[in-house]
């Protein structure tokens, strides 16, 4: 019966409960707080029983039984009789009393000591007017029978054991009331309304109110007095008013009573019990006495009225509440009032001001109670208002408190995940071990515990707050704080190091943690969170710092683990899902090398280059094991993870490989947070705990990389190298000083440690490389970890015997690509997990910085400088560059770079060379450090500020890749260094070309050329570093990208690339100015192209052909085929294309929003901009002089827009390139994307899209006519080439067009730009007519040759390109999305129309006309622009966006048929949906884009489905939230 009755009520209770929260809030918001209280508190008791239980234990059960009762009858009338209660409340507690009268069943029970019981009493009272009267008497008389009305709930409602439950008659309840007042001030009625709504809002306050209403006796039990007893008065009034109402309430109220002893009513009352049943155990005690009191009365009215009066109760309550229907019970009510008055006044005292006022009002009401329902209403209104205000404030307080509690919980969970990190500060050995095991265990446990939620929070915080804030904030407060967390985090992350005793265990904890981190995302992530923040990669705030730190650490583990063949083979996949964290971590970890050592051993190389992970781990193990035996090595392992300290060093020695992964993460901590937090910790640890280990710690960090284990044993030499590296690292101007201040100052020392780490890593790397051939592998793994550059540096040092290692590393580059690809996938899931690119960027930036410093120092051995560059880049970027050098060092770098730039410009001044060298030399000398700071620090921080951490590492990665490519390029042109961070040491582009044959050994010849160029630029060390890095990059590029020339995949590829470069340089050399000029585009191209090595290769292939065509234009068009033959080999194309296209590309790229030079120019502002303007002017003059120059200028402008897109897509597209140097390319992709995004934003903000179009149009003046003719062919053939090279067709198109024939580049860019900007296209057509024939020939030949690119390269680049492009779109948001979308579409278009494009190379001119499509697409706005603009080829792959008529539209595009209106229409919808889905569903989209679109319709449906699902999720979740 009870359940049935309750079920009757149940339908109402659920709505009531549903409405309770809303009603509660609403009533809390409104004056009917009593009603709200009633609605809300029963609901809360249902939903949040615990909260009510806290405040009122009895209330919980009572509230439920009350809720049931009120739901049964007053549920609907719950609001209604809540209103009557409000009237009653007028006398007592208007807000709550009303609820008490009818809703009092629920509310009053809550009011009583036990949250639910008093509401039950009120519900009972509300159920029957007698109940309410009884409530009042029970309150006054302390009747036990009052509890019976909460009978079922009474167990908690010990005091509320009033006859209140009895809905019989007022007399019965009055009897109950005396018992209640004497026993338990069962003023639940009055307090019920208040109580219930207060329990929701503030149980304590309601408790006080209940105390007021409750008798002084009851006042001692605050739980009961939590309910406002004024409601009791109101309840009394209501009871008096409600005979029928009381009966209905009785029937309703009898349900709780029934639990006591009600016969038939008991069953009905039990319906309320379901809620109170939970508390019935406690209530039962009270229920028995209540039953005793109530058994006779309650059954009558409650049973009689239960069914009848439910409806009546609603009506009666409504009426009574609306009208003063309480006259009938006024007399009794008055008596009760008088009784209640005294307890009320007493309760007023304990209650508090609000309660006192309510009590006073209630007392007054009680005085008036006989007549004044109006008075009650008035009092109720005042009380309601007060209650509402109080409730609102309480609710706000509760919300704040819950938020604070949640934050505390999250922080605690993070700290727990960091695990014994707290102790790590005090004791390294214990915390290290503890944190190690804790990191493992906590990673397994906490990582899962906080994995998704914490991860999401961290990611959101991370994206919300750029790591810049974290790193700037973290450097000082967080550095100390995160010194601890970093220690813990490092310990946990590097727990493998402490566990190095169990080498496998440390691998498990490092790799396993990486897996956990990747899988749990927060297993090690919480631990890694501080580490990542200390890395300064890109972390958010205090807790977010941990979050940000986590992603770098996770990335370190993730990227490293992917590289770890043995252990991480399984883990990489597990970790990759967490790539968002892993991406940053791995990239930064690799730069951090020290922490990444185990990963270096197993996965450090593997992280960047999976293929090398097997050979390198062996070498690393070999090297690290010898070093493992050394305490220094152990120190270095621990040093990586400074918190570990030397105390645990022996353990890391046990398993350096194992410690490597953990250390790698920690290295990230010390670098990312070392700059910010972890490095302070390192400085702290090294200063206080390990003053000496501080140097060894960086050394150890490098040693942890296991390449530098040997060097760690030679801590002195290592320290010297470290200092050299740090000093060499001019980019962090403070870093050079850090070697000494390192120990004294934590932030500086942290940075110093980080810088030393990286410098030491590189120094050890290179030193080891000099020391042993094994060190080569070690160096290579270190280089792999920190990016291809360190490896290349090492390779350069021992390029003769290092080539096999390079080959391995190059193979590892593919793992890096895969890692980045996985990172892309992870980025799908975690769009803000872009930190992967930041990671790489950091390492690249550090390398660049180090190399820049080396260039400036010029006295470092290539080994030391290379290693230092890698490590220092991270150090420079992450440590003080991030916290201090971002604003300071970046500007100083700018200043220094500006003088250097001027000097270099003066040195390399040459019609083309001076322009490019100016920019490039400027970038080379100081722009790279500036870049490092800009990207890793300023730009990286901007990227982080803008959209997470990716920029800094992306820039570093991109710089590294570009530096590598530029190093390759710089053999042809020394200017490239400016554009890419590493290219800093490639300041002299002209000499590079001439010197390429000198060091042609493999990449060494290349590097010799670079070195020669740099020597010209007085940067010998930078040359070596550039050579090494370029060597590594060449090896990487050749290995993976040089699929055309797989015969010499590693050594031969390098040699061939060098030969190609030499040929290029020779080809370019005949025209020194042209070579320089080409070098500039090449560098620019390399900047973007190298960031996307595979994609750049195709682009470079085109660029090479263009360059050679440029040279051919000077030297004859025959060279384009030659270069294109090389171009087939992506690596060769990269080198030769970099050579040929470097000057123009450089200019164009730098001018392009995404171009680093342009970005740096903007960063440098006046000086940089002036060189850029000068370069533009000079380029324009040369443009007038040479078609190539003109094309270059056009490309500069177009690249500003289209190259920005191309760069962004190159940077986003680098995933194809990522497949080879995936880590690097992904980083580059992100970096360029962010830079280009910033640049584009700047450009767009300055000129807007139209301005960009206008610029493109202006620059396309020469290419306009040609664009029309060869635009389609260039786009199509280039799309083929790009497809062949697996480069994003559009990006490759842009780059290739930029390089292939700048006219073509402009055409394609314009076709992209035209698609996105039809105005540009029209102007383009006009302006391009200047030299269409030659350009078209070059473009056509280049496109045809480009189309000849191997399909392997094409497909590889294709996949990554799409995913990266979408990443870029999502990351770049609106502006970049447009450009990216167009470029993406172009690439998709080209891919889709790959075969058609190949067949229709001659038809491309019409396709190049993208006017029609852009016009139509322009109509469709940016979405159509983005997705429809690339119409020609991508329509298939853009099918997700453009479903209807996509195929026909594609054909139309190919045929230049303007039947694209259908497509734009569907595309507009689809494009908008797709673009939205791109932004919102990056993960799904990336997956979809990752795999070429099977069908346009299928793709579109998939995108639409994903988008709709995402939107529904977001929309559905937001209201709930």
From Swiss-Prot:
Subcellular location field? Nucleus
Q: Name one GO cellular component term.
A: nucleus
Q: Which residues carry this modification: Phosphoserine?
A: 910, 1142, 1482, 1514
Q: Which UniProt keywords apply?
A: Isopeptide bond, Nucleus, Phosphoprotein, Ubl conjugation
Q: Which residues carry this modification: Phosphothreonine?
A: 996
Biased composition range(s): Basic and acidic residues: 1325-1335, 1467-1476
Is S-adenosyl-L-methionine one of the keywords?
no
Q: Which Gene Ontology BP annotations are present?
A: response to bacterium; transposable element silencing by heterochromatin formation
Question: The organism sits in which domain of life?
Answer: Eukaryota
- GO terms assigned for molecular function: histone methyltransferase binding
Q: Where is this region: Disordered?
A: 621-640, 1093-1147, 1204-1230, 1312-1335, 1425-1444, 1457-1485
Q: What is its main location?
A: nucleus
The UniProt entry, under InterPro entries, shows: RESF1
Show the cross-link location (Glycyl lysine isopeptide (Lys-Gly) (interchain with G-Cter in SUMO2)): 223, 1411
Q: Which Pfam families match?
A: DUF4617
Task: Please describe the quaternary structure of this protein.
Answer: Interacts with SETDB1.
Q: What does this protein do?
A: Plays a role in the regulation of imprinted gene expression, regulates repressive epigenetic modifications associated with SETDB1. Required for the recruitment or accumulation of SETDB1 to the endogenous retroviruses (ERVs) and maintenance of repressive chromatin configuration, contributing to a subset of the SETDB1-dependent ERV silencing in embryonic stem cells.
Q: What is this protein called?
A: Retroelement silencing factor 1
Annotated source species:
Mus musculus
């Amino acid at each position: 019966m009870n359940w049935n009755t309750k079920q009757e009520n149940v339908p109402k209770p659920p709505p009531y409960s549903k409405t309770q929260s809303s009603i509660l809030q609403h009533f809390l918001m409104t004056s009917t707080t009593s009603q709200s209280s009633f609605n809300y508190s029963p609901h809360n008791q249902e939903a949040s029983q615990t909260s009510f239980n806290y405040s009122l234990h009895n209330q919980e059960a009572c509230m439920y039984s009350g809720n049931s009762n009120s739901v049964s009858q007053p549920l609907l009338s719950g609001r209604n009789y809540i209103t009557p209660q409000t009237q009653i409340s007028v006398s007592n507690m208007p807000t709550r009393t009303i609820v008490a009268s009818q809703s009092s069943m629920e509310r009053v029970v809550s009011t009583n000591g036990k949250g639910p019981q008093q509401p039950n009493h009120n519900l009972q009272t509300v159920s029957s007017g007698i109940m309410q009267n009884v409530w009042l008497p029970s309150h006054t008389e302390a009747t036990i029978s009052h509890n019976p009305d909460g009978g079922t709930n009474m167990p908690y409602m010990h005091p509320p054991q009033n006859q209140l439950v009895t809905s019989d008659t007022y007399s019965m309840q009055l009897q109950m009331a005396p018992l209640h007042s004497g026993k338990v001030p069962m003023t639940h009625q009055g307090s019920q309304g208040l109580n219930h709504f207060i329990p929701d809002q503030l149980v304590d306050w309601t408790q006080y109110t209940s105390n007021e209403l409750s008798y002084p006796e009851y006042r001692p039990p605050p739980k009961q007095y939590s309910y406002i007893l004024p409601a009791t008065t109101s309840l009394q009034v209501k009871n008096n008013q409600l005979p029928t109402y009381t009966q209905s309430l009785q029937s309703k109220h009898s349900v709780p009573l029934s639990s006591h002893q009600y016969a038939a009513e008991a069953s009905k009352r039990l319906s309320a019990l379901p809620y109170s049943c939970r508390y019935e155990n406690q209530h039962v005690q009270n229920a028995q006495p209540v039953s005793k009191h109530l058994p006779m009365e309650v059954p009558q009215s409650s049973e009689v009225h239960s069914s009848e009066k439910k409806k009546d109760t609603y009506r009666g309550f409504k009426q009574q509440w609306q009208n003063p229907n309480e006259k009938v019970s006024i007399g009794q009510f008055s008596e009760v009032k008088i009784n209640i008055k005294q307890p009320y006044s007493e309760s007023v005292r304990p209650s508090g001001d609000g309660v006192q006022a309510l009590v006073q009002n209630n007392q007054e009401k009680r005085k008036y109670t006989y007549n004044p329902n109006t008075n009650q209403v008035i009092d109720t209104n005042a009380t309601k208002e007060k209650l509402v205000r109080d409730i609102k404030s309480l609710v706000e307080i509760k919300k704040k408190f819950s938020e604070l509690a949640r934050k505390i919980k999250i922080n605690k969970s993070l700290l727990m995940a960091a695990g014994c990190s707290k102790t790590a500060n005090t004791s390294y050995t214990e915390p290290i071990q503890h944190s190690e095991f804790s990191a493992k265990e906590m990673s397994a446990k906490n990582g899962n515990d906080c994995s998704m939620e914490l991860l999401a929070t961290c990611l959101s915080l991370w994206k919300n707050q750029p790591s810049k804030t974290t790193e700037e904030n973290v450097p000082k407060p967080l550095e100390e704080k995160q010194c601890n967390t970093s220690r813990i985090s490092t310990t946990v992350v590097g727990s493998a190091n402490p566990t190095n005793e169990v080498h496998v265990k440390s691998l498990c904890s490092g790799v396993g943690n990486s897996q956990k981190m990747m899988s749990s995302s927060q297993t090690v992530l919480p631990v890694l969170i501080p580490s990542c923040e200390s890395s300064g990669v890109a972390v958010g705030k205090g807790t977010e710092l941990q979050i940000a730190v986590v992603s770098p650490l996770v990335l370190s583990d993730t990227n490293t683990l992917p590289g770890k063949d043995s252990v991480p083979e399984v883990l990489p996949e597990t970790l990759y899902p967490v790539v968002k964290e892993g991406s940053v971590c791995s990239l930064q970890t690799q730069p951090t090398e020290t922490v990444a050592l185990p990963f270096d051993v197993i996965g450090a190389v593997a992280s960047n280059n999976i293929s090398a992970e097997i050979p390198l781990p062996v070498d690393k193990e070999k090297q690290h094991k010898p070093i493992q035996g050394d305490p220094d090595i152990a120190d270095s392992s621990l040093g990586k993870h400074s918190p570990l300290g030397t105390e645990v060093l022996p353990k890391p020695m046990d398993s350096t490989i194992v410690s490597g992964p953990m250390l790698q993460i920690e290295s990230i901590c010390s670098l990312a947070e070392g700059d910010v937090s972890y490095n302070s910790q390192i400085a702290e640890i090294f200063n206080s705990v390990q003053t000496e280990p501080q140097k060894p710690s960086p050394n150890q960090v490098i040693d942890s990389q296991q390449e530098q284990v040997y060097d760690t044993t030679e801590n002195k030499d290592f320290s010297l190298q470290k200092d050299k590296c740090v000093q060499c690292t001019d980019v962090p101007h403070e870093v050079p000083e850090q070697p000494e201040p390192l120990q004294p100052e934590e932030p500086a020392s942290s940075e110093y440690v980080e810088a030393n780490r990286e410098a030491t890593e590189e120094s050890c790397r290179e030193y080891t490389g000099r020391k042993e051939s094994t060190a080569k592998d070690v160096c290579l793994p270190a280089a792999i970890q920190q990016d291809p550059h360190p490896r290349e540096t090492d390779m350069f040092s021992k390029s003769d015997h290092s080539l096999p290692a390079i080959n391995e590393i190059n193979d590892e580059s593919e793992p890096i690509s895969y890692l980045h690809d996985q990172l892309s996938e992870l980025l799908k899931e975690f769009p803000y997990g872009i930190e992967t690119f930041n990671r790489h960027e950091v390492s690249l930036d550090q390398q660049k910085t180090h190399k820049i410093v080396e260039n400036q120092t010029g006295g470092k051995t290539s080994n030391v400088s290379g290693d230092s560059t890698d490590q220092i880049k991270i150090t420079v970027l992450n440590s003080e560059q991030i916290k201090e050098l971002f604003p300071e060092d970046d500007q100083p770098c700018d200043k220094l770079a500006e003088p250097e730039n001027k000097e270099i410009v003066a040195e390399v001044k040459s019609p083309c060379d001076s322009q490019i060298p100016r920019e490039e030399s400027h970038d080379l000398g100081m722009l790279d450090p500036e870049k490092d700071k800009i990207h890793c620090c300023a730009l990286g921080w901007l990227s982080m500020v803008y959209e997470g951490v990716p920029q800094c590492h992306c820039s570093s990665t991109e710089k590294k890749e570009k530096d590598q490519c530029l190093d390759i390029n710089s053999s042809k042109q020394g200017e490239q260094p400016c554009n890419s961070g590493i290219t800093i040491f490639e300041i002299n582009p002209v000499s590079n070309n001439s010197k390429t044959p000198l060091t042609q050994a493999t990449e060494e010849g290349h590097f010799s050329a670079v070195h020669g160029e740099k020597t010209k630029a007085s940067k010998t060390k930078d040359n070596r570093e550039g050579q090494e890095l370029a060597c590594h990059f060449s090896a990487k590029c050749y290995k993976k990208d040089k699929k055309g020339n797989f015969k010499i995949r590693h050594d031969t590829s390098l040699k061939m690339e060098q030969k190609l470069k030499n040929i290029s340089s020779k080809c370019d050399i005949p025209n020194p100015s042209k070579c320089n000029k080409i070098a500039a585009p090449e560098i620019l191209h390399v900047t973007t192209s190298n960031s996307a090595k595979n994609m750049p290769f195709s682009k470079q292939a085109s660029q090479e052909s263009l360059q050679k065509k440029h040279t051919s234009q000077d030297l004859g068009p025959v060279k384009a085929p030659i270069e294109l033959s090389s171009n087939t080999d992506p690596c060769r194309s990269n080198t030769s294309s970099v050579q040929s296209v470097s000057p123009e590309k450089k200019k164009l790229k730098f001018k392009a929003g995404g171009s680093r030079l342009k970005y740096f120019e903007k960063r440098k502002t006046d000086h940089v901009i002036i060189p850029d303007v000068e370069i533009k002017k000079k380029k324009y003059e040369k443009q007038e002089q040479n078609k190539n120059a003109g094309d270059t200028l056009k490309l500069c402008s177009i690249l500003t827009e289209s190259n920005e897109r191309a760069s962004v897509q190159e940077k986003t597209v680098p995933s194809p390139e990522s497949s080879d140097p995936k880590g690097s390319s992904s980083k580059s992709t992100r970096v360029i994307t962010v830079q280009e995004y910033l640049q584009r934003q700047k450009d767009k903000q300055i000129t807007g899209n139209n301005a960009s179009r206008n610029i493109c149009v202006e620059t396309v003046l020469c290419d306009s006519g040609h664009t029309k003719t060869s635009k389609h062919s260039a786009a199509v053939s280039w799309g083929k080439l790009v497809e062949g090279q697996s480069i994003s067709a559009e990006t490759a198109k842009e780059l290739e067009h930029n390089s292939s024939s700048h006219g073509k580049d402009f055409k394609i860019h314009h076709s992209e730009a035209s698609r996105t900007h039809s105005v540009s296209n029209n102007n383009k057509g006009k302006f391009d007519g200047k030299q269409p024939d030659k350009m078209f020939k070059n473009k056509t030949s280049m496109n045809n040759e480009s189309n000849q690119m191997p399909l392997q390269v094409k497909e590889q680049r294709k996949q990554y390109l799409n995913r990266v492009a979408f990443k870029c779109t999502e990351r770049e948001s609106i502006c970049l999305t447009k450009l990216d979308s167009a470029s993406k579409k172009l690439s998709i278009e080209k891919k889709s129309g790959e075969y058609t494009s190949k067949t229709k190379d001659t038809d491309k001119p019409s396709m190049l006309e993208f006017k029609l499509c852009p016009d139509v697409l322009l109509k469709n706005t940016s979405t159509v622009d983005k997705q429809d603009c690339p119409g020609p080829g991508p329509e298939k792959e853009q099918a997700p966006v453009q479903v209807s008529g996509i195929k026909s539209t594609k054909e139309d595009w190919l045929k230049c048929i303007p039947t694209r209106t259908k497509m734009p229409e569907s595309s507009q919808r689809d494009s908008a949906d797709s673009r939205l889905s791109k932004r919102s569903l990056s993960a799904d989209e990336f997956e979809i884009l990752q795999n070429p679109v099977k069908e346009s319709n299928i793709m579109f449906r998939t995108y639409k489905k994903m988008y709709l699902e995402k939107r529904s999720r977001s929309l559905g979740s937001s209201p709930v939230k």
